Amino acid sequence: AAHELRDENGAFRGVVHRDISPHNILIGTNGDVKLVDFGVARSVGRVSEATRAGQLKGKFGYMSPEQARGKAIDRRSDLFALGIVLFELTTSRRLFRGESDIETLKLVISSRIPRPSSFDPKYPPELERIVQKALERDPAQRYQTAAELEHDLRSYLKAERIVVPQGGIASLLKRVVGSRIEQRRRAVRGALKSLAAGMSL
C-alpha cells in the first residue's frame, strides 16, 4: 500500500521502505501480517539525496544489488528484499550472509543466486519461478510492483489448492505462543495499573 501512496496532486510519492526483512514483518494475534519500521523509508527523491550522501540504510543481508552499490533505488528494490525473505522462508537457508558486513555486501552485489531447487529437488517449479523473478539482479527484469508479485503468489496457491482457512493463522499463533502473549498482556496491564496508582498520589 505504501508504494501506491500519492500526493495532493495525485502523483505517486514513490515511497521505498529500504529495510524489508524478517525482523520487520510481524504477524498480529488476529493473523494479519504487518510490515513495520518505516524509520528509514524515503520517497524516491529523498532516496536519491541519501544515496548521493553515501548513506546505506537497512540490513545488508536484505538489500538489493542497486541499494548495496549506493545507487538510486525505487520500489523494485523492496521487491528484491521480499524475494530474499521468500527464498529464506521456503528454503530455511540464508541467502546472503558473509563473515563481515563488507563481505555480505559483496555477496549481494555479485554472488550467484542459487535456485531453491538446488537445495530441495521437490521445490515447486512455479514457486521457484516467482522467487527467481523477484531476485532478478536487473530491476527491469524483476517484478515491477508488489501487486504483480501478489498476483503470481495467489495464482500459485490457487493452482496448488493451498488454502489457509479464515482465522487459521490466528489459531496457530494462539496454540504456539498464546500463553506468552497472555503473560505480556498481564504484565502491561499491571504496569498501567501501577502507573495510574502513582499518578493519583
Question: How does the language model describe each region?
Answer:
Residues 33, 46-57:
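Regulatory activation segment
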Residues 23-28, 36, 59-199:
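C-terminal lobe helix-coil module of Hanks-type protein kinase domains
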Residues 9-10, 27-31:
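Activation-loop N-terminal segment of eukaryotic-like protein kinases
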Residues 19:
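Conserved catalytic-loop position in the HRD/HxD motif
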Residues 15, 33, 74:
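Hydrophobic "anchor" residues on beta-strands that sit immediately upstream
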Residues 1-15:
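Protein kinase catalytic-loop region centered on the HRD/HxD motif
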